[in-house]
Amino acid sequence: MLRKAFLMALAFALSSSAAFAADVPERKSLQVINDITKQVRQYTRYTIFDDVSIRLEDNGNAVLTGKVTMPFKKDDIGRLVGRVQGVSTVQNDIAVLPVSPFDDELRFRISRAIYGNSAFWHYAAMANPPIHIVVENGRVTLAGVVQNNVERMLARSLATTFGAFSVKNELKTDAEMKETLEKL
């Protein structure tokens, strides 16, 4: 008798949890992307010398691309993203930058020039500044978000003065980012 009552209670619990799961709406892509972005930005070892991009596919697969300075960052970020509700799998295509004293020196010089410029002081005071400086084999990529096109051009101008082989400017303005998010 006790076993029968237990089985009935278990069946009721399972059926009610299945019904509850059916009532919960599926999370929207924008919500999931915002949660993934929050996880990456709050990762304490994510710096201005790293850049990670996120693409969320319809099946809940999160595709991570970009470049980080240390191998453990790639693994940690992949694990953090995998814990986000709405992410079914993580495809971690983040590349690890090679170790190079020349690249390190270039990173520090460019970051001092950009964040030391009075036009960018308000960014430098942020916990996670929005301009990311990725240096790979002497080639610089500026990524992130700035307020307007003038700041984008100034950042590029400051980055070109330190002997980099090339400077690729992938900075986006607030307006461009807003437009991109509205398409989601």
Where are these regions (language model features)?
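N-terminal targeting leaders
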Residues: 2-8, 14-184
